[in-house]
Curated annotation (Swiss-Prot):
Functional note: Probable helicase, member of the UBC2/RAD6 epistasis group. Functions with the DNA repair protein RAD18 in error-free postreplication DNA repair. Involved in the maintenance of wild-type rates of instability of simple repetitive sequences such as poly(GT) repeats. Seems to be involved in maintaining a balance which acts in favor of error-prone non-homologous joining during DNA double-strand breaks repairs. Recruits the UBC13-MMS2 dimer to chromatin for DNA repair.
Lineage: Eukaryota, Fungi, Dikarya, Ascomycota, Saccharomycotina
Keyword Nucleus found: yes
Protein name per Swiss-Prot or TrEMBL: DNA repair protein RAD5
Gene for this chain: RAD5
Organism of this sequence: Saccharomyces cerevisiae (strain ATCC 204508 / S288c) (Baker's yeast)
Binding residues annotated for ATP, in chain numbering: D532, E533, M534, G535, L536, G537, K538, T539
Note in the entry: Present with 1520 molecules/cell in log phase SD medium.
Zinc-finger ranges (RING-type): 914-961
Amino acid sequence: MSHIEQEERKRFFNDDLDTSETSLNFKSENKESFLFANSHNDDDDDVVVSVSDTTEGEGDRSIVPVRREIEEEGQNQFITELLRIIPEMPKDLVMELNEKFGSQEEGLSLALSHYFDHNSGTSISKIPSSPNQLNTLSDTSNSTLSPSSFHPKRRRIYGFRNQTRLEDKVTWKRFIGALQVTGMATRPTVRPLKYGSQMKLKRSSEEISATKVYDSRGRKKASMASLVRIFDIQYDREIGRVSEDIAQILYPLLSSHEISFEVTLIFCDNKRLSIGDSFILQLDCFLTSLIFEERNDGESLMKRRRTEGGNKREKDNGNFGRTLTETDEELESRSKRLALLKLFDKLRLKPILDEQKALEKHKIELNSDPEIIDLDNDEICSNQVTEVHNNLRDTQHEEETMNLNQLKTFYKAAQSSESLKSLPETEPSRDVFKLELRNYQKQGLTWMLRREQEFAKAASDGEASETGANMINPLWKQFKWPNDMSWAAQNLQQDHVNVEDGIFFYANLHSGEFSLAKPILKTMIKGGILSDEMGLGKTVAAYSLVLSCPHDSDVVDKKLFDIENTAVSDNLPSTWQDNKKPYASKTTLIVVPMSLLTQWSNEFTKANNSPDMYHEVYYGGNVSSLKTLLTKTKTPPTVVLTTYGIVQNEWTKHSKGRMTDEDVNISSGLFSVNFYRIIIDEGHNIRNRTTVTSKAVMALQGKCKWVLTGTPIINRLDDLYSLVKFLELDPWRQINYWKTFVSTPFESKNYKQAFDVVNAILEPVLLRRTKQMKDKDGKPLVELPPKEVVIKRLPFSKSQDLLYKFLLDKAEVSVKSGIARGDLLKKYSTILVHILRLRQVCCHPGLIGSQDENDEDLSKNNKLVTEQTVELDSLMRVVSERFDNSFSKEELDAMIQRLKVKYPDNKSFQSLECSICTTEPMDLDKALFTECGHSFCEKCLFEYIEFQNSKNLGLKCPNCRNQIDACRLLALVQTNSNSKNLEFKPYSPASKSSKITALLKELQLLQDSSAGEQVVIFSQFSTYLDILEKELTHTFSKDVAKIYKFDGRLSLKERTSVLADFAVKDYSRQKILLLSLKAGGVGLNLTCASHAYMMDPWWSPSMEDQAIDRLHRIGQTNSVKVMRFIIQDSIEEKMLRIQEKKRTIGEAMDTDEDERRKRRIEEIQMLFE
């Protein structure tokens, strides 16, 4: 190394060395900016460049007089354009170029080329090696570089700089790091830009919609380099643009003043810039006071929801849910959040993992002398670079790595299954709670009280009150403020506006929130999800919480109205947003399906042991003013029970603006108060966030919120999003955040990451126990009697077989043609209709042509259903003729005449006896006559026929041994409804289905072995329930069985009456409840019954499991036997295989509607294999 270079290095770092030289030689690595400190090139590779001091006043040269002088003389368009490009051009040169090139077609281009060729003696050279590398420095990556480490020997004259001023409403800003950024010139300059010149970043002035910049998944679909411009601050003139990766960071952040940037030119090779040339900037980054200001979350949230609710880009993709789609505002919010993540990564800001160590290190730095750093010392620089790279992996904040392990570790430590087993048991006071809780329910009560931070009322193990007391919210990270290494602080000793001497700041980079105060865990939402398996007593558990903590202890006896809690849901009209709603601090609102309203009411009565507490059923206009009842009376109800339908109706009325301002102020409905606690039962009912029901429930306001559901996921993982949103779990309730960490990985088939994130989100707020779990002593949580599920496979009846084969042929042709042409998805609706028909035939031929409101495959306006009606009617007639008219007309008349001779009047039928069972007299409604004139019970005769067929024996009359035919039988029917006269008619076996025949047989066997049993029969088709009701009523007399039917067509009063009557044991006769799987598959307590029959399979096995668990749950004392009727060699057997597949891989694997359809197509192909 030369003596001159050694001397230069000493002068750079030592104030005591002086010189009178007017020029300073420095390396092309531009070591006057600390950003080049990590360079460690060999001396031989260094390029020495001479930069002369600028003549005094040259930087202030003005072009305004030249322009004004030319304007006075008049100018043409050529001169205007020329001065716009090169405003510094002298007047004589402007006029010369105008005279030479002004009249030519490409004159402006020729003039610029001539000017740059003849007015610059500086040759173009390359930028130093690797200019695109973004070298960064902040105090977190290299604390040894401080402003005091640099001692320039004299004050240099830098390029033009404005006096630094804070933006509007910004009170301070603080340095967080700097980037070395390579710019590309988009306009030429007349002379070299001076070192230290201040630049400015601007966004494109053109208003661009977020949808043009980002796609629906938040991914960039347009170049951002063209949207961020670099301006010379002296002339406010664009000179260049930044690279794409830097523009992706800057573009979203330049829209506000929360992040501030100072841009300084640090290298342009001491030459004028031509279009396409590169130059290097130092980008100093600051956080301003605005980003730390406490935000009006209620207002922003309301605005976000309003936009979301009315967004026209959100499309309905089917009945099973909708793909989550972001609004413009949500896309912009996500882009800003991602930009923050990338910026912190670029700056290599590391979160503080040990605050105590960070404080000790900070004290050492304050007390130590400034260190002189030799930038030319390769060993020192390489060590610093190594340290930076070793720490780089710790500074990745983007969502791909997301530092999820730390989050999951915390959650698992706080809410692992082992920790749940060791939870203390809280016993409710006998003064308020009448029932006896099981041990796991007492532990659950402890967990729920802790979730509501009612530590004084929960059993203590010495740790509860301290849990999370001073622990930082795991969604946030702690950072140490770096020393100010900005260019202005380093070179101009310019102090930025100071903030109070804080050492740390806190950031939730995933939500874009910042704080100067430590965000502790207690700020998290009160409430959670109780997701115990069906039958473990979620209703009783909820009431144990409500009665143990019936009111808000922070408010009761202090004030009646919560003035501070005035947030109004943004789903309501804007006229509501300024109204302060009273706080019902003593009331819990419980929202349930209508079918469970009576059950919840009865359960409260059973559980409540306090005369001071009561409940109110808010249904059917029974309360004139709910607001008055809850806030203006001394003893408001402890619980208000209502239904999803009531919530939806009130929200719809208000949200459509039907109420005036005055009406709103005196409104007395559910939205007129803020509740202390809100509990929603069967919470999966709000899983589709675009439905009216979901929006209505979201609009309810409460301090504590609980969701009860045994099946939080029905069809898609995104079903959980609505539960998270209802519970206000930040930042997960922000759709952009949910999409980034859950939906997008899931759609990308990265199931493990998506489920890991979901587990991390839900683990602290979700409690789930199953019947198979054991307590700390190894005993089952609940001792339930055994449950037996039997599949009974049945053959088709002859009429069913004929129908099924005809429909199967048509379905196979449609499916195979779709596969051959590759348009199977386009035939999706048609195929569903074919499948529906096949399923209906398996149940009963009478279902053919019906369109059931409960069927999941069809919408109510599906035209394909009705289009097949004529064809199916024709087919049914063919079947009827084939099986019912086995007699010719002459044969039928002759047989009837022979029977009339034997049985001339009604009295002759009174002595009829069945030759098989010897019953006398027979029930004439069930009597069948053979051609030989002998009579038998319908049931006995067909059992005989079935036995003979199974043995491949011929059918002969049990009496006379003459040949008989099952299709040539006669029955007795009344001539009309008002007459008692009986006549013979052909018996129609086509009206019987295999399942109904088998059901009747099973019910008769049960009646014979154990009279007085209560039986539940499930079907998803309400039309099938009608047929079953008719068959059962016809088969069993009122003395033998009582038939009930429960489906969606019943009113609340009728439902209550049916369930109450069915629950009463009658030892003299059988009670049979026909139950719609959709109306009664969840929530109902049917432990009074111990026998169930599933008449048809459901696509989702979890729905069937829920239905069975209506019987097999707490309170059941008998063994439960379930029989599933399946037609062999039919579509139903293949549906069983699909169910097993779903049980194996989980039902949450459907991502969006298109993905769900593709999976269903795979299932369809399985059905027709």
